[in-house]
Design a protein with these regions (language model features):
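Transmembrane signal-anchor helices characteristic of membrane glycosylation enzymes that use polyprenol
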Residues: 25-51, 59-63, 69-71, 170-178
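Short glycine/proline-rich turn/loop motifs
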Residues: 37-44, 83-95, 127-136, 178-181
């Protein structure tokens, strides 16, 4: 099977754009993007919630699901005590801490957050939203969303331009832009999710 896929891949590698590309070759091209991305997770991935933006993205998820509110006082206090948050601004209307970041990443992280919560429930980790299972889960979510984005973009580029231009473009975009950094080294930022 793998030998046939490899043969189809080579046969279809230099087909001109718009040609009918074999599905096996297309799948093999996807594997050449997705598998290295997954392997790099083992070497580069650093799951942690840090920095003003990363903390401000994550507190939506933690506060909404565990506190059932959007009062970030306890979350911001927790991160400030650990030196991960520098400044809190108070909203003049509500008197509560404001959040300068959007909630989009938290919405995308929600299934992963609940997976982390499940792991925390069945292991000795704290179920407070700050322990390792939560952090690892949402950071894995960012990396997996970015990998899914790479796979979708690969499919579109293969269909539109052919396999070789698609792979060259994907590797240039992935390795030549900050995407690699935000996928693996700073996954609490929104950039990996928004790719």
């Amino acid at each position: 099977m793998l030998v046939q896929s490899w043969k189809n891949f080579i046969d279809n590698l230099l087909l001109p754009p718009g040609s009918l590309i074999d599905k096996g070759a297309h799948r093999f091209a996807l594997c050449l993007v997705v598998l290295p991305a997954l392997v790099l997770m083992f070497f580069l991935w650093k799951p942690w919630i840090h920095g003003n933006d990363g903390v401000r993205h994550y507190v939506y998820c933690r506060s909404a699901w565990l506190d059932l509110d959007f009062n970030f006082t306890n979350e911001f206090s927790w991160y400030m005590a650990r030196g991960e948050l520098q400044k809190i601004t108070i909203d003049q209307v509500t008197g509560l801490p404001g959040n300068s970041q959007g909630c989009g990443s938290a919405v995308l992280w929600s299934p992963f957050f609940w997976l982390g919560h499940l792991v925390a429930l069945i292991t000795p980790y704290a179920t407070n939203g700050y322990s390792a299972p939560y952090v690892w889960a949402v950071c894995a979510g960012t990396s997996l969303y970015a990998i899914a984005g790479l796979a979708l973009l690969t499919s579109v580029l293969v269909w539109r331009f052919g396999i070789l231009p698609a792979l060259l473009s994907i590797y240039a975009i992935w390795l030549g832009s900050p995407l690699l950094f935000y996928m693996y080294l700073h996954p609490s930022m929104s950039h990996g999710c928004s790719f």
